[in-house]
């Protein structure tokens, strides 16, 4: 009985210690909404919802365009490239987690059809490796090799990314078929506005929670602001604003509920795109070539036969 109590005590002590360390880690090293692929992997079983919406849009609220280019058709067991473009103005800077300006990072999630996967290094030709650069791709889940994520990586270098993809061979993979398949892309530039727990990052606008008068605004050494608002019923409401957004209000100003207290510093955004690719059957191509060849030969024989008939007619007329 005493041994059981000791085990329970040790278990509780370990649990409390781990919880304390995690709490301290969050306070000392605040979350960076720059690590968007990790957030999606940790919180969602699949990156694409039943509605077709990619879950990255839950944290990255602004919409921006993305592009994807793939071949119209590929042969089985061949390596092809999927080109992902995440365009943005390279001259602009974003607000970093510490409130200072910095360059934008980019990231992407590529949802391939079942059976398609990242090409192994030994199958990637040298010219394709040169296009890929130092990008590191990883599967969304160990069991989901058809879903690839990359980033965050520097946007100035990788606003255009090349994914090396290996097409499946239906003769080996019985889950693959010679069909037309959709490919889905989610791409982002810049940091998010909301963390997975629902809290705001410093890369978004902060609004007044109540209607009232601003009585004081204080800033700490790190640039964060504490805004005190007295409501019409004489309640004191304190709004904490992290370093990054620019304050639009001053002491003595009257504000309404949901009125912006800061600007919106976000310059990035998330976008979705899709494409289609055909897994082509080589026998079908061979059959098509044979058909075209037979049509050409038939036309040639028809012309020759016609000329021969004309010669016979001409000979009969001369006779």
UniProtKB/Swiss-Prot annotation:
It is found in: Plastid, Chloroplast thylakoid membrane. Heme binds at residues 36, 56, 59-60. PROSITE patterns: CYTF (PS51010). Keywords: Chloroplast, Electron transport, Heme, Iron, Membrane, Metal-binding, Photosynthesis, Plastid, Signal, Thylakoid, Transmembrane, Transmembrane helix, Transport. Pfam families: Apocytochr_F_C, Apocytochr_F_N. Binds 1 heme group covalently. The keyword Transport applies. One of its GO terms (biological process) is photosynthesis. One of its GO terms (molecular function) is iron ion binding. One of its GO terms (cellular component) is chloroplast thylakoid membrane. It is a single-pass membrane protein. It comes from the Eukaryota. Its cofactor is heme. Gene3D superfamilies: 2.40.50.100, Cytochrome f large domain, Single helix bin. The chain crosses the membrane at residues 285-305. Residues 1-35 form the signal peptide. Component of the cytochrome b6-f complex, which mediates electron transfer between photosystem II (PSII) and photosystem I (PSI), cyclic electron flow around PSI, and state transitions. The 4 large subunits of the cytochrome b6-f complex are cytochrome b6, subunit IV (17 kDa polypeptide, petD), cytochrome f and the Rieske protein, while the 4 small subunits are PetG, PetL, PetM and PetN. The complex functions as a dimer. Belongs to the cytochrome f family. This is Cytochrome f. It comes from Zygnema circumcarinatum (Green alga). The lineage of its organism: Eukaryota, Viridiplantae, Streptophyta, Zygnematophyceae, Zygnematophycidae. The gene is petA.
């Amino acid at each position: 009985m005493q041994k059981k109590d000791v085990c329970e005590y040790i278990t509780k002590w370990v649990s409390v210690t781990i919880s304390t360390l995690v709490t301290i880690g969050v306070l000392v090293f605040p979350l960076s909404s720059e690590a968007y692929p990790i957030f999606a992997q940790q919180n969602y079983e699949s990156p694409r919802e039943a509605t077709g919406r990619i879950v990255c849009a839950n944290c990255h609220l602004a919409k921006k365009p993305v592009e994807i280019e793939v071949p119209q058709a590929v042969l089985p067991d061949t390596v092809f490239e999927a080109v992902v473009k995440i365009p943005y103005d390279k001259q602009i800077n974003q607000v970093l987690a510490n409130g200072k300006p910095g360059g934008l990072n980019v990231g992407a999630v590529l949802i391939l059809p079942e059976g398609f996967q990242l090409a192994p290094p030994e199958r990637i030709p040298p010219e394709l490796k040169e296009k890929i650069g130092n990008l590191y791709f990883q599967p969304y889940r160990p069991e989901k090799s058809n879903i690839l994520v990359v980033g965050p990586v520097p946007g100035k270098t990788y606003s255009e990314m090349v994914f090396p993809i290996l097409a499946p061979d239906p003769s080996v993979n019985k889950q693959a078929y010679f069909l037309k398949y959709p490919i889905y892309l989610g791409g982002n530039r810049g940091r998010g506005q909301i963390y997975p727990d629902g809290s705001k990052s410093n890369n978004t606008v902060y609004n007044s929670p109540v209607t009232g008068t601003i009585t004081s605004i204080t800033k700490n050494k790190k640039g964060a602001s504490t805004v005190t608002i007295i409501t019409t019923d004489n309640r004191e409401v304190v709004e904490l604003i992290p370093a990054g957004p620019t304050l639009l209000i001053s002491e003595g100003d009257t504000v309404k509920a949901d009125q912006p207290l800061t600007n919106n510093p976000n310059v990035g955004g998330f976008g979705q795109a899709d494409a289609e690719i055909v897994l082509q059957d080589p026998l079908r191509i061979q059959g098509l070539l044979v058909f075209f060849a037979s049509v050409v030969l038939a036309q040639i024989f028809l012309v020759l036969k016609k000329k021969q008939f004309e010669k016979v007619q001409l000979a009969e007329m001369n006779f």
